Amino acid sequence: MEKNGYKPNAITCGTILNALCKIGQTSMAIRLLRKMEEGNFELHLSVYNIIIDSLCKDRLVTEALNLLFEMMSKGIQPDLVSYNSLIQGLCNFSLWREAITLLNEMTQRKIVPCVRTFSILVDTYCKEGMLIEAKKVFDMMIQRGIEPNVVSYNTLIDGYCLQNKLKDAIEALNMMVERGCSPDVVSYNTLINGFCKKKRIDEAMNFFHEMSNKGVTPDVVTYNTLIGGFCRVERHKAALELFHKM
């Protein structure tokens, strides 16, 4: 491009940088960023956010944090997108303490967390088996006026099922419905799987009928889980009947 007498501008370089990150060429994107800095381009927050997110996806969270500090030293302040990428990156390494620190930091900066911010933290706590902490973050989200979505509820339901806290999982489903969030096939599949693992196949079937009555279409995961559940309790005839209904 430059050989033909055309000098790339910030928009051109930003587009290329975004493309590089999307194909996993983060190191090349950083080299382009350095060239942009050398060329005295006016760098916007969006450029840094693209690379921070890409570094986090590459599990290079330390490098992402360093870029955040570098960006801030240049007077460019992070936004919700910046923090969500970093919180996700930290949580991928189960660094939930550091993630909570960032949550507190963004609050101090008057940056309002969104449902994704809280859902990331709920998911991390659930995977760590820290259900009390997961519920606290979930409740904090509601207290701050942020309505959980189906992903948030499914994450909490899954956390309870993983720890065999099926009563709590049902309560989470009921709260979901009460607050006007419609359960989806994942919500029911998670509960059905939890009950099948505990050999409570009749209760699992109750959820199967409930989802059908509410217009939620069972998928192959639903049927496979229930068929496996019937086989686990040696009700092979029922398993075969369900197989023929697929």
Question: PLM features: residue spans?
Answer:
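Methionine-biased hydrophobic packing positions in alpha-helices, especially
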Residues: 1, 36, 71-72, 106, ...
